[in-house]
Amino acid sequence: MLTPAQQHFNRVMAERRHASREPSQLEMTAYETMLHRLRLDKARLSRVQSQKAKADLKRELLPDYQPWIEGVLTADSGQSDDVLTTVMIWCCDCGNIAEALRIGQYVLRHKLPMPDQYRRTTATVLVEEICDPVLAAFKANPAVAPVAADLLEALRGLTLNEDMPDEVRSKLLKALGYTLRLTDNVESLTAAVEYLRQAAVLNPKKAGVTRDIELLQRALKKSEIGRAHV
């Protein structure tokens, strides 16, 4: 765990490095130190086989990177930063979706590259890293939404104009549809049907939402009949 003085130093160094066109030796050394920390932490993670244990370890490690992240976002320079993009992905893995989206907005706006081991675009990574666990959770328990609808809506808005495979965007629309169908709000249920329809259009063979759409349409029809008799 970093001391308050170390946290302050890392934030200031990150801000200065990203605010300067020609970072000083001290600022570059600070970045190299963060990359070294990242390599060591990745080595620790590589020795862990359980995905849950990996997520727990990432959650434990992330606070030491937060001052650097705040400095980068404050400088808002758009320089590439492997620490920033890696932390964004770790936040997805830990379920800290709000922070992942906060960083993701910056990464997408500045069109920053992903770390070398990721051969997907930022938008694709964000959608898959967030929505794959959401859909897996719904498969295990369809009655509980693992991520709030407003966060998934934010992800949709963030990636709306970004290029990605249709199958990937279909996952996001399916996750949104499954989340909104758990409400008793007619508007949300109507939106759920529309999202699931869009998911089916983008991935007609594998979306697997035909039955869900039928059930939702029946529920909406019953709701309309009930309101007509009030």
Q: What residue ranges belong to the model's regions?
A:
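Short coil/turn linking the two alpha-helices of tandem helical-hairpin repeats
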Residues: 92-95, 131-138, 177, 182-186, ...
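Extended, charged low-complexity segments
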Residues: 186, 190-229
